[in-house]
Amino acid sequence: RAATRSDRHTPAVKQADELAAILYTSGTTGRSKGAMLSHGNLLSNAQTLKAYWGWRSDDVLIHVLPIFHVHGLFVASHGALLAGAKMIWFDRFDPKAVVANLPQATVFMGVPTLYVRLLAEPGFTREACRRMRLFVAGSAPLLIETFNAFRERSGHTILERYGMSETAMLTSNPYAAGDGERRGGTVGFPLPGVSLRVDAAAGETGGIEVRGPNIFQGYWRMPEKTKEEFTADGWFKTGDVGKIDERGYVHIVGRSKDLIITGGYNVYPAEVEALLNDMPGVAESAVIGVPHPDFGEGVVAVLVARAGAAPDAAALIGELKQKIANFKVPKHLFVVPELPRNTMGKVQKNLLREQHKGLFGGA
């Protein structure tokens, strides 16, 4: 337990603005950068999450996340530490071991891939989850299919949230029932103390910008890069693209670097991926843009088939043409055994773009 302080060491007194950690970004689209987080950044986020997610001293967290990343090192650990709760610590994710320990736990946090693997375990049942009060997902998009299947199987609704190395947590779906419903496909509302805006007209898609006491101090030894990432009025440009719906829920559309511009038109991959993921035989998809001699970029989809299925590319394209503008429809579909991911479960689209860059002879 973390409820009492050890008398074997003298606590180090630190000021809120002193550097606490340098956390390197995931780097799915380029070179990783060292985000400098202060003690004040970490404390403000920990206190906010403790209150918002209702951390208690009798909580038991199943901790399976790597501690080189903000999700495992801060988001999961700090809530338990601040509340004086217990942690069951795993050095890696083992679905059978997690299921075996669920009956004595109350909180679990994981990336979407872990929830898919839990659903594949026969022992993952409502009975196994009887003491659980909170399942949190983040670090990568959670498929609506996984969201729905998990609720049906466990009786629990996953709480999806949004954050990044530079900011820790920014938004969260509601925890308390009185604060609203947890909506699949969204990351909820800005957390208390966090301001969030979208650089676009109301309801439209644009760049997400944030500010608050949780925002980092800058990138380690990269002053020019730090300056580039903040607006003139002090808002941090997350590099994510999203929108705020009429009910105030934040939707993440994707990374700005993943935006495809084909023939002068913008294509947001998440829109096309959501449609593909709902089609027969498709387990998941990644939509990318690769060099095209006529259009600048050509839209390409990379699919993973469901077990035992063989997706019909022509049929999928035909269905897409009935639902979205023609310029958004992939010019090619590829079926692969799995999508490349980093350690936090994010699809590495940069690797897919590199693999298919010569497809149209535009590289």
Label each region the model flagged.
Residues L19, T25-T28, L61, I67, ...:
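Conserved S/T- and glycine-rich ATP-binding loop of Class I adenylate-forming
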Residues R5-Y24, R31, G54-V60:
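Conserved pre-ATP/AMP-binding loop-to-beta segment of ANL
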Residues W53, L102-G110, L119-E181, S195:
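Gly/Ser/Thr-rich phosphate-binding loop
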Residues Y175, T186-G193, A201-E229, Y265-V267:
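Conserved ATP/PPi-binding loop(s) of AMP-dependent carboxylate-activating enzymes
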Residues A200, G212, Q217-G218, K225, ...:
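AMP-binding/adenylate-forming catalytic core of the ANL superfamily
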Residues S139, G163, G188, D240, ...:
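Active-site glycine-centered loops adjacent to acidic/histidine catalytic or metal-binding residues
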